[in-house]
Amino acid sequence: MTKYIFVTGGVVSSLGKGIVAASLGRLLKNRGLKVTIQKFDPYINVDPGTMSPYQHGEVFVTDDGTETDLDLGHYERFIDINLNKYSNVTTGKIYSEVLKKERRGDYLGATVQVIPHITNMIKEKIMRAGTITDADVVITEVGGTVGDIESLPFLEALRQMKSEVGSENVVYIHTTLVPYLHAAGEMKTKPTQHSVKELRGLGIQPNILVVRTEKPISQSMRNKIANFCDVEPEAVIESMDVDTLYSIPLNLQAQNMDEIVCKKLHLDTPAADMTEWAALRDKVKNLSGEVKIALVGKYVQLPDAYISVNEALKHAGYTIDANVKIDYFDSEKLTAENVADELKGYDGVIVPGGFGDRGLEGMIQAIRYARENDVPYLGICLGMQMACIEFARDVAGIEDATTGEVNPKAANKIIDLMADQEDVENMGGTQRLGLYPCKLKAGSVASAAYGNQDVIQERHRHRYEFNNKYRDELAAKGLVFSGTSPDNRLVEVVEIPENKFFVAAQYHPEFLSRPQRPEGLFQAFINASAGK
């Protein structure tokens, strides 16, 4: 029988529900259980693919091409699993599917309502996440805060799950805040009490409380919270701020959270062996070297827009005992006149993905600086496209080289709309998305980065591609096309072998990086940046 764990949040948002859920998933996996995890987002968008990075942060892409919440990146990195379309469910997706069924006549003339039709669809998504992966445990995080009107159908579905699958197969975890009032010198439990009261008013009695605190909670305070919220004192789990996220699974384990969960779910498993994880935590806390990377992008005001890139850079740094210090540069503010002063002193330059014409010329200036000064460069998606345009302009002499994304009628579109995108009308969910194979050129820098593999599988998210009309012309000037689709039609990787490291990929390598298994291109880039 599949077991279900539901993680909700109260008092305020951004308490770290996603990290708690991911940490618990890691603990249960290390107990020998097969775990899957999903995020419910209460917004009306079908997915975050068309949302501004300033509002939502990064759009994380799964193997099957689903555009998802950035929390799925945390899940994949912490638990080291690959997720799917059932791992991110939005209100928009639920309503869209229910309305399609209604139009087909699937409800046989019934009045379609939130209960039971919407809640049944939500429960179907929960159960499907388990059956499609054959998981022992499904962990479901509900976005937002208890009390939000948008979350009510999801919470009602969670309430119904208890009677549907049996109380012995369900655990409810509620994350709350115990604030410290500096003026009074006291910690206050009242917000937690009220949050749990509101959750109980919706029919859900939490089994475990994870309380976010600034200072340690005393045993007497733990007892007080337990008494007012009707949980066992040992089920009140303290979650203090930490210097590295990798401490959180170990902190939860030290408070027996995974043991409490397994006992409630009648799961007889050995204790989680977290030796390797503890070693990772210790390494991260004691890095001796430093590598300075300049990240040049369009959305740098919100670093969460590049969170997987940031994490992938850090993962590669752990391998060489180096802290990767990332400084952000707004590409709109970089010019031919100031780029050298701005980027001087950095060990490497990276230009990640993005959309639209804003800030492209600044990216091109950063790429030119890296190429001409032999500073290690890694381009991702848009960063690969701009690298091709910079090379075409400044090396091949095609002065008006550009992208069809800026000017669809330009004479020299080095980057152009993919043929199968020309008749696409809807913007959402229609890009080239998900895992695709890439054939690597033997002896290339890219091939070496991946252990001389012939073919790799990487995740994509793009609508434009390199225009093959210019492949021979740029190759004659020294640009190596070191990665292509197996049929050789789509350019996936370009490089300049004369430079210390100048590699750019159309795909998004950051989505497959793990803290204990860095992604190949990122590792090669950081090695070159560190002079290894």
Swiss-Prot record:
Binding locations of UTP: S13, K188, T189, K190, P191, T192, Q193, K224
Binding of Mg(2+), residues: D71, E141
Catalytic activity from the UniProt record: UTP + L-glutamine + ATP + H2O = CTP + L-glutamate + ADP + phosphate + 2 H(+); L-glutamine + H2O = L-glutamate + NH4(+); UTP + NH4(+) + ATP = CTP + ADP + phosphate + 2 H(+)
Residues that bind CTP: S13, D148, I149, E150, K188, T189, K190, P191, T192, Q193, K224
EC category name: ligase
A Pfam family matched in the record: GATase
Location of the Glutamine amidotransferase type-1 domain: 292-532
GO biological process: 'de novo' CTP biosynthetic process; pyrimidine nucleobase biosynthetic process
Entry-linked Gene3D superfamilies: 3.40.50.880, P-loop containing nucleotide triphosphate hydrolases
Subunit structure, as described in the record: Homotetramer.
Protein task: Catalyzes the ATP-dependent amination of UTP to CTP with either L-glutamine or ammonia as the source of nitrogen. Regulates intracellular CTP levels through interactions with the four ribonucleotide triphosphates.
UniProt protein name: CTP synthase
